[in-house]
């Protein structure tokens, strides 16, 4: 975010220059100096304040540092711009406001959506829709699993709290514009659902507004809808458009024409917004430069900051209410005291797609479950009765997590990045887990590998005795990490005297919330390109069946097979999987790409890769989509012992 600030400052027309940057990271300081070469660099904020006399300090640091840094800046006589979320608690905001007034300085918050075109246009149109009677602020987003730099992102609830100010301040600002005056006692109602969905009702005078923020609602969206006695305004912040319906719309001709008017506005507005964005070469977040200009102008003229104290304060307080509600959810999912019927299990990877289901199933069958993960899950992602311990498998803390355990299920693995990441977080972590388990006296280990580590059937069926791939790097970093981890497990089991069971799941799919496996094809908007033939079978396994199988193996470890290719007992065809996909996406168009077409295209792509990246490993796309045949006999026998998979 700091780089966006540097670019936006450089783009302002109000005379302003970036004179200094403070960052404990040399990489961070250098990245800013590449944008603003004249900026002097400091390793700490205290050093910067001793060496410089800035008019404005931009605070673009982790949230837990905002209050202290803002207070230091105000005490030094600086105006302060604070990125959202501004601070964690209303009491902190009140203290900063008091200090700013005392020092005759101002505070501005990172509420840049108010300076984007949709918000500005909507404000201009407000008088045309008559007396406002309702405002709706809606925000739907998908939490990131990785940052742009490839690091593990914040957990989902913290991502929610990070973006929450946007829909909150939009609602508050429109309420303030429509009905000036203090909000009546804060939120009228506020709730946080078990999936992280926030619902709220806020009121200012006679005008009420609703707030909805969801992690699971689709499509991703962000809008404000204002309804008045003479029409409505829909400000769309995803497509950067505004659709307006001015007039009562009660006549027969209006009812017929309104959809066409809205369609024209949407198509024209979206096309224009795309053109403006590309034509201007947007280098920072939309609205950021405009907000900076307005704030700097207010400082030069001695006027009020562009974001009112009331809006900033109420935004912080509403977000604080949500933070407290989320903390309440965490209390509800705390481990319950009970008499365990099964072993004590350390589960790595217990916050992932498969791991979450395994943790729930282990707890359900009576195991004491301890999950070790690099970050704690959001409250709504925690399994009841499961203990979560934050730590890195390659660092200290693993030995402590293993204390009192009877068994380890090692399901953690790197899922992104290149060779170094998979070497560290798949292969290296696997070695650390097994050696630590042996040192802690935990002799039973279930290692979760992947079906992708096995060589091709070459006309026969792949079963538990099929050899591993000879060229471990031929299928990319992920498969290489999984394959070398399995080889390492086999070696260390003998060296350390461990009893190890290896489970190789096929592509894991959740039939209750269906997302197509990668080997089925690729979705491009509303078109799905399916590769191969409708009759091809895919080596997949139902998430629920996989979790119940792993829990059953933990409960009856001694009877578990040494190797298990975990698959659905009856493998589905691509046609069957596409039929399920179409059920959830009735507007989807399916196009088939036969293998006889893909093979020459893949050969051409390999040639281009060798020309463009000499010495690099070329990826054979046709090999990725090859059709293999699997012997599901062992999975079928286990399924019968578990009853039919749901």
Outline where the language-model segments fall.
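N-terminal Rossmann NAD(P)H-binding glycine-rich loop of SDR-like oxidoreductase domains
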Residues: 343-365
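NAD(P)H-binding glycine-rich loop region in Rossmannoid oxidoreductase-like domains
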Residues: 55, 389-428, 432
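Predominantly a Rossmann-like dinucleotide-binding segment in NAD(P)-dependent oxidoreductases
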Residues: 113-184, 518-526
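C-terminal helix-rich "cap/oligomerization" subdomain common to oxidoreductases
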Residues: 56-58, 289-342
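Mid/C-terminal beta-alpha module of Rossmann-like enzyme folds, strongest
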Residues: 196, 226, 333-343, 549-618
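Conserved Rossmann-fold NAD(P)-dependent oxidoreductase catalytic core, especially the SDR/UDP-sugar
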Residues: 108-110, 428-478, 501
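Rossmann-like dinucleotide-binding domain that binds NAD(P)(H)
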Residues: 147-219, 225, 310, 544
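Beta-loop-alpha module in the N-terminal Rossmann-like domain of NAD(P)-dependent dehydrogenases
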Residues: 5, 36, 40-99
């Amino acid at each position: 975010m700091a780089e966006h600030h540097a670019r936006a400052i450089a783009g302002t027309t109000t005379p302003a220059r970036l004179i200094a940057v403070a960052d404990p990271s040399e990489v961070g300081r250098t990245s800013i100096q590449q944008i603003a070469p004249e900026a002097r660099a400091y390793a700490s904020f205290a050093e910067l304040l001793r060496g410089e006399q800035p008019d404005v300090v931009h605070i673009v640091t982790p949230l837990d540092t905002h209050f202290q840094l803002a207070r230091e800046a105000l005490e030094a006589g600086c105006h302060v711009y604070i990125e959202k979320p501004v601070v964690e608690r209303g009491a902190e905001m009140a203290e900063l406001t008091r200090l700013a007034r005392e020092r005759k300085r101002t505070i501005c918050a990172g509420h840049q959506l108010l300076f984007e075109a949709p918000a500005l246009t909507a404000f201009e149109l407000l008088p045309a829709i008559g007396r406002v009677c309702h405002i709706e602020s809606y925000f739907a987003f998908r939490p990131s699993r990785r940052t742009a730099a490839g690091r593990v992102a914040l957990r989902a609830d913290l991502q929610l709290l990070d973006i929450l100010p946007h829909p909150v301040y939009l609602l508050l600002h429109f309420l303030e514009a429509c009905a000036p005056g203090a909000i009546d006692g804060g939120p009228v109602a506020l709730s946080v659902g078990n999936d992280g969905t926030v619902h709220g009702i806020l009121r200012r005078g006679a005008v009420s507004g609703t707030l909805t923020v969801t992690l699971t609602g689709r499509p991703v969206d962000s809008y404000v809808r204002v309804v008045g006695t003479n029409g409505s305004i829909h400000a769309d912040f995803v497509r950067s458009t505004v659709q307006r319906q001015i007039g009562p719309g009660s006549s027969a001709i209006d009812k017929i024409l309104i959809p066409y008017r809205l369609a024209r506005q949407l198509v024209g507005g979206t096309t224009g917004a795309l053109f403006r964005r590309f034509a201007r070469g947007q280098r920072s977040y939309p609205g950021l430069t405009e907000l900076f200009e307005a704030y700097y102008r207010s400082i030069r003229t001695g006027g009020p900051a562009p974001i009112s104290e009331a809006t900033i304060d109420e935004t912080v307080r509403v977000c604080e209410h949500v933070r407290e509600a989320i903390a309440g959810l965490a209390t509800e999912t705390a481990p319950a005291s009970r008499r365990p019927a099964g072993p004590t299990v350390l589960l790595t990877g217990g916050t992932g797609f498969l791991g979450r289901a395994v943790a729930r199933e282990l707890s359900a069958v009576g195991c004491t479950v301890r999950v070790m993960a690099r970050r704690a899950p959001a409250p709504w992602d925690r399994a009841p009765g499961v203990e979560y311990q934050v730590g890195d498998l390659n660092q200290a803390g693993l030995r402590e997590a293993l204390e009192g355990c009877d068994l380890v299920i090692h399901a953690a693995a790197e899922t992104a990045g290149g060779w170094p990441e998979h070497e560290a977080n798949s292969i290296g972590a696997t070695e650390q887990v097994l050696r630590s388990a042996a040192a802690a006296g935990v002799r039973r280990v279930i290692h979760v590998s992947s079906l992708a580590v096995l060589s091709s059937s070459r006309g026969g069926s792949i079963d538990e005795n099929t050899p591993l791939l000879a060229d471990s790097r031929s299928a990319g970093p992920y498969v290489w990490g999984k394959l070398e981890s399995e080889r390492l497990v086999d070696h260390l089991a003998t060296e350390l005297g461990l009893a190890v069971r290896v489970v190789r799941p096929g592509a894991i799919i959740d039939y209750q919330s269906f997302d197509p496996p990668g080997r089925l094809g690729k979705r491009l908007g509303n078109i799905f390109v399916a590769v191969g033939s409708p009759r091809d079978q895919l080596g997949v396994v139902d998430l629920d069946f996989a979790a119940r199988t792993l829990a059953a193996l933990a409960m009856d470890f001694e009877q578990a097979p040494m190797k298990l290719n975990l698959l659905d007992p009856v493998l589905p065809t691509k046609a069957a999987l596409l039929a399920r996909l179409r059920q959830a996406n009735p507007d989807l168009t399916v196009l088939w790409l036969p293998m006889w077409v893909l093979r020459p295209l893949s050969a051409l792509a390999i040639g281009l890769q060798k020309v463009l990246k000499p010495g690099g490993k070329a990826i054979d796309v046709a090999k990725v989509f090859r059709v293999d045949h699997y012997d599901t006999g062992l999975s079928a026998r286990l399924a019968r012992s578990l009853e039919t998979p749901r």
